[in-house]
Structures are given as structure tokens and as C-alpha cells.
């Protein structure tokens, strides 16, 4: 595409612009028109987005005959002021601007306008917009901003910032409005129509005034303002001492809204509330004063209970007859509702429920039929329960414990038994030998210990039971019966007898040593208990014999 054509594309201000095809297909090779610093825009011209379209200057377009085909230039300082503080930039020109309700409708008339070369810009000097100091300044080239459309348009555009300027200033292009449910009382301050409020107020004061202006209809036909926001024009200074009184509340509410007659009086509202004594009489009873010893405890509990009620008035508990009667007003209908009794019954019911839930299984002994025992056991087949006694007996003997005592006839039959070894008829326990014969307890133990039958010479006619420790026999621990049966143990043993039993001969020793039996033991013999008598012996022989005896006894022990 050849862009070197003689046709030039310019804005209505005379400013050349790129064709749409040049922006998409390649770079622009055409020539820009010359710069004319004396050019100004007509006041009647209200531009819109249509001004961005390219226009052929050879077809009697607007400003085609202007001298020098002047371009529009923008001042950087004015541009910065315009973008940063838009309302302030137009404060100086608001009276000279001619507002247009429909800017785009004026554009169709520009083709019929005829500009003469002789007139140059004389007609433009009388334009309202030309008189402003904003567009008479030096304008930077190659800038595309539709100033006339922004200044003359009253239509709203949903672009930030969302704020308003106070009347009679022109609102910014951002006028995002919301509909409020109730008409505001202070809408005139913002320059809105009815039932419209800014979405984002410009300052904190606007936010407070907007909330303070919201009114709510009541049944009495009056408006009750939102007391949570104070108007910045009439601040209310509250004191700590008088802030809670009904009169101060009514005054503060009237100062917030500006009309005290339209507000519901706080004192009238509090006067319609029943007193504490009336409210207590209608409260359901929850305790009885009969359960307390003194009236002081009842008063203290009443004060605690009154905290749960509405705090409209202070009760007078000091009076006796005119005010609350502790035992006449509240105790009526409260009989039988003592808290202690209720707690006891509740605990008893809970305990009963727990006992029912934790009821133990009732076991019965399979053998003897008892229901109580320190420990329940089971039979060998694990099918039945046994008490502790029957379980131990069954575990030891493999049979059930007998329930009836032993018959005396069976004991009489045992009296006819005779030991097969010693022919004894009395014993503490009858046993069986390895051949199956009945033997006494002594013969049975001896045969089990030594592996052969007990000698008949060891038989004794009287049954003696073993006693552990020192017995009644004295230091030796032997009873008289044992000494009578075994006289050898009670006699002293001479040294000659000891030597002869060991195969030693000592003709020179005659009745020289006598050894007594040590208590409780048979082999524990020492020289301390030996009684030696010397007749006529050499010392060397005696020492030698003593060493031999000591060695023999040490080996035997």
C-alpha cells in the first residue's frame, strides 16, 4: 500500500493522524501538515468519539481552508493539571462554557459550516471556549485528547475516580450512582437527584453525612436517624456524668437530626417499661427462700438473680413492708422446689441409671451352688463356673469337691489296716509302696527316700510330729519322748569310742574326751563342746591326737 498519496488525514483540529490501515499494515510514509500556533477550536463545536475518524481535507472538510492548516498543540503543564485535578482546571471556565446535552449531535453540522480565508480566525476569537485560558496556551503536537467533549458533556461515564464535587461545580465524568431505599435528608449537599447517592464518597465527611442522612420510617410517622454517626457541622460533646440520663439522650438525639420533635422520647420509652418489682412477680420461680436460714442470704441471692433481669430501675431492698417481701411475694408457689432436694433427687436418679447399666452377671457355682466367692473359676472344660474352693479342689485332684463331710464308717474301716512293713496300726497317713501294699507314713517315706524298705529296728510305737525351732525339750530341742526312745543321743561319747569307730587305737587315752551332742544337728561337733580329761599324757601325743580328730571331723562334715 502506498502512503505517499497527496491525501492527508487530519483530525477536526487540523492535526494529521494515521489511517487505520496504516496502523495495521505498515509504517506511515506520508507528510504531516504544518504547525499553526494561532489555531483555536470553535466554541460551538462539541466533539465526541467520532472525531477520531480520519477526514479528507480536499473534500471541503473542516479547517481545510485554515491558514497553514494549523495543528493543535497541548501544554504539558496544563495537561498534567487536567489529569491530576480535573474539577479545579475547569473552575475558571465553567461560566464561559456552553454545555451541550448531546455533543455528538453537533458534529453533523460541521460539514455545512463555511470558513473563509479572509476571516481567518476572527470568528473563532469570539467563541466562548476560545476565551478560556486553557486552550489558548501552547499545545503540544501529536496529542489526541477530546477536551471539548469532556468539558461540555453532562453524560455519566463509569470510569474512576468515583467522586463528586459540590454544587454548583460540574461533576466529574465518573458518576456511578446507586439507588438508596429511602430518600436522603441531605441530598442537596451532594447535588444528586432524589434516591441517588454516590457509590464512593469523596471524603470521610461525606461518608458520615451520607450515613447520618439515612432516615427510617416508624409507626408514629417520625424519622429516627442513625445515632451511630454524628454530623460534622454540629458535634456533640458528652460528659461522663450526664451521658446516661434520659434527658441527655433525647438532647443528643435531637442535635444529631436537627429536629427534636420528630424523635421518640427516651423517657417515654423507659416509662412504658415495667419496674423491677413487677417483673420479678411475673418471673418463674427457680428457688425458695424457705431453704435459707437468714434473710441476708436471700437478699444476696436476689441481687445475683436480679442481674439476669433488665436493669430498668434499682430495687429498694432496705424497706420492710412497702418494697419486695422476701417470703411473701417470691415464696408463693415455690414450696417443694428446694434446690438441695432437687439436686439430691437428680443424683439419686442418675445413680440408679448407672447401677442398672453396670449390673453384674449373677454366677452360680456348678458344684456347690454358691453365688458369692472371692474369685470365680471355671471347670476343666471351660463350660461352667466354680467358686474358688471348688475350683482349687478340682484343679488339684481332678474331681469335684465333696459337698458332705466324710463318713465315720470309712474311718472305722481304716482302723483295721496294718502296715505291710512294720505291722504298725497307727499312722498319720497311710501310703502305698511300689508293689501296691499299704504301709505307714514312716515306711512309705523311708522307701521313697532310700529306695528300700525301712528297717524294723527303727519302728517306734508313738507318733511324733516334727517341731521346727526350739521346742520344750530345752537347748537341744529334743523332747523327753525322743530321748526315751533314742537314749544313745542323750549320752556322752568318749574319745576312745570315736577313735575306735574310725579305726584308731589309743591305749594311752582312757576316758580322755567326752563329746556332747550339739543342738538341732548331728554332725556339727567342735572342740569347744568337747570335755577332755587328762590323766598322764604327753603333750605331743595330745596335740597330735587333737589335730587328727579335727581333721577327721572336718572331712566328715
Curated annotation (Swiss-Prot):
CDD domains under this entry? Answer: ZnF_GATA (cd00202)
One Gene Ontology biological process: negative regulation of TORC1 signaling
Read off the InterPro entries from this record: Transcription_factor_GATA, Znf_GATA, Znf_NHR/GATA
Sorted alphabetically, which PROSITE patterns does this protein's record hold?
GATA_ZN_FINGER_1, GATA_ZN_FINGER_2
Q: Where is this region: Disordered?
A: 234-258
- Composition-biased stretches, type Low complexity, lie in 243-258
The record's subcellular location field reads:
Nucleus; Cytoplasm
Q: What superkingdom does the record give?
A: Eukaryota
Keyword set for this entry?
Answer: Activator, Cytoplasm, DNA-binding, Metal-binding, Nucleus, Repeat, Transcription, Transcription regulation, Zinc, Zinc-finger
Zinc fingers (GATA-type) span which residues?
365-390, 419-443
Where is it mostly found?
A: nucleus
The GO terms describing molecular function are:
DNA-binding transcription activator activity, RNA polymerase II-specific; DNA-binding transcription factor activity, RNA polymerase II-specific; RNA polymerase II cis-regulatory region sequence-specific DNA binding; zinc ion binding
Upregulation: Translation is induced by amino acid starvation. Translational repression during nutrient-rich conditions is dependent on several uORFs (upstream open reading frames) present in the 5'-UTR of the mRNA; these promote ribosome dissociation. Translational induction occurs in conditions reducing translation machinery efficiency, leading to ribosomes scanning over the uORFs, and increased translation of the mRNA.
Disruption phenotype annotation = Decreases the mRNA level of genes involved in amino acid biosynthesis. Increases the mRNA level of genes involved in the response to nitrogen starvation, including genes required for the mating response. Decreases vegetative cell population growth rate in low nutrient conditions.
GO cellular component terms?
cytosol; nucleus
Note from the entry: Functional homolog of the S.cerevisiae GCN4 and mammalian ATF4 bZIP transcription factors.
Q: What does this protein do?
A: Activates genes required for amino acid biosynthesis and acts as a master transcriptional regulator during amino acid starvation. Binds variations of the DNA sequence 5'-GAT[AC]GC-3'.
User: What protein name does the entry list?
Assistant: Transcription factor fil1
